[in-house]
Amino acid sequence: MASVIIDDTTLRDGEQSAGVAFNADEKIAIRRALAELGVPELEIGIPSMGEEEREVMRAIAGLGLSSRLLAWCRLCDFDLSAARSTGVTMVDLSLPISDLMLRHKLNRDRDWALGEVARLVSEARMAGLEVCLGCEDASRADQDFIVRVGAVAQAARPPPAFADTVGVMEPFGMLDRFRFLRQRLDVELEVHAHDDFGLATANTLAAVMGGATHINTTVNGLGERAANAALEECVLALKNLHGIDTGIDTRGIPAISALVERASGRQWPGRRAWLAPVFTHEAGIHVDGLLKHRRNYEGLNPDELGRSHSLVLGKHSGAHMVRNSYRELGIELADWQSQALLGRIRAFSTRTKRSPQAAELEDFYRQLCEQGTAELAAGGMA
């Protein structure tokens, strides 16, 4: 099985989400959880933010857990100097690489960028640090210029990171870009995707198909602006759709997802597989097929996430599922009872917008029996 390296940036780009601020204990807890999950590389902060940030980064580095740790730095002397005191072994030196950003953000040009890449990559290596060269706004940059930047830095062999900073790539274009870079650069390549058009995960997968060896992710897709490629989606899709191993223990995904949700104060759409709805079935046709053979309606094995299929009753259930559910409660139904209870269940779900619980199902059955008894009594009196 082929492999891809996860470089998770929950503790850096994830925390850059508007309104998200992890405290030290939360950062350490997330760091421990990522290590338990088997994530090999982590961006743990921005040392130029100040001594408080650097102190937390040192505490994280001092845990002595597995995973290589990166500090995110602008491509400048101050940031590189600040990173040296944090205990990390690797720096992500980030440089705007599009003409638009070079001109309107830094008031610089391509020649300046090439010179700074050569100088600061060399300085970082001499300081004993490994380097990832972050190419900010690579999706809007001239691709030949990205190759020139990669060639300048190639002696130090930092993996260039292709950042779709404003999320304007689509999968076919991303595939072509990485094939282009792979043909011209004999280095590892990393992708950093944003979700402006809901394509961060798809673009990340396309980059891997084009030759990316490293991928940036965040837990739950947490991240600045439109967020990032979700660790969970990327790991599960690479494994199940492409047979690519990331070394991640997927059974730990629900727990770390919940941890980051609490720490960030951000809740995530119920559609996401690791939060269980993908394994919850109501529609009669689906339930019938699942009971006959689980793979009839199983694209993702819930065992990978420590989950199991859940069959619930609702508006779209059939009489067979009603009988099966009541059998689990120790109640055997006649056909007419199944049909009568199905009507009650559908009315309940329409009114309450949820599935009935076991106690409510028992109430429905009791009411049905009482109704039948009353009707029999009324008939006898007549």
Swiss-Prot record:
Q: Which family does it belong to?
A: Belongs to the alpha-IPM synthase/homocitrate synthase family.
* CDD domains listed in its UniProt record: DRE_TIM_NifV
**Gene3D superfamilies cross-referenced by the UniProt entry:** 1.10.238.260, Aldolase class I
Q: Which reaction does it catalyse?
A: acetyl-CoA + 2-oxoglutarate + H2O = (2R)-homocitrate + CoA + H(+)
Q: Which GO terms describe its biological process?
A: biosynthetic process; carboxylic acid metabolic process; nitrogen fixation
Question: Is Transferase one of the keywords?
Answer: yes
**Domain of life assignment:** Bacteria
Identify the residues that the record assigns to the Pyruvate carboxyltransferase domain, covering every copy: 4-254
Transferase recorded as keyword:
yes
Top EC class, one word: transferase
Pfam families, per database record: HCS_D2 (PF22617), HMGL-like (PF00682)
The record's function comment reads: This protein is a Fe-Mo-cofactor biosynthetic component.
Tell me the protein's name: Homocitrate synthase
Concerning InterPro entries, the annotation shows: AIPM/Hcit_synth_CS, Aldolase_TIM, LeuA/HCS_post-cat, NifV/FrbC, PYR_CT
For this protein, the Enzyme Commission number is: 2.3.3.14
**Molecular function GO labels:** homocitrate synthase activity
Which organism is this entry from?
Azotobacter chroococcum mcd 1
Keywords per UniProt = Nitrogen fixation, Transferase
- Spell out the PANTHER family in the cross-references: HOMOCITRATE SYNTHASE, ISOPROPYLMALATE_HOMOCITRATE_CITRAMALATE SYNTHASE FAMILY PROTEIN
